[in-house]
């Protein structure tokens, strides 16, 4: 993890100080198309695994629409989807036990969101909230950080956010390391460190101090419908962000073809290095296209 963090931090510094995006514009032309395909593949995989009935599908569609067209709060979409599916599954029991159906992480995120603080603390807390809400891995962090850093705080543009994802896709580290890039652009070196710390802190603290409690929640039949609903909301959120990413990264017929081809390869092949090869391949092809055709 440390090598990936240091690489991302170094590239983030170059991105800002050496205007890397301008110098590597031809490379990013294809890389961004690959990012759209990568996130789209995550949506398909999550949906095929967790959307198992019509109500869950409807909740995913609702989460997609609310996020894309109404800019609804990430947390409210997830809580709403969870409560809606709980009501659908166990309406009468829910009325009698409503207070037991609010997972601590979601409540904590709502409280954290109400605090007015300095920039450094904001960066850390946005990372912490993203870490607390990592349903489904790194891909769930993408819509949350996109909403927080681009739409709410305006630390980055959509294009810069996608650049960060593209860089993260080629590093020898989990994709979630792109959060270091977001933090650096938001607040410099300290911002990169604080965002990364916030993201990864729950992953270290929860297993050590809250493992038994979290396992109990996951295995509790009363809570399971809520968590299934939350997962459906996550699918909708990531789908909405996929559309936003593609809207920014697919700028012509060539990038559209690259995105479709990248999605097809990612969907069919599941090797450990597939993502790296696809992202680098799209970057190289895009650079050639920019130099010769576009």
Describe each region flagged by the PLM.
Residues 1-171, 175-294:
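Multi-pass membrane proteins that catalyze or facilitate reactions on polyprenyl-/lipid-phosphate substrates
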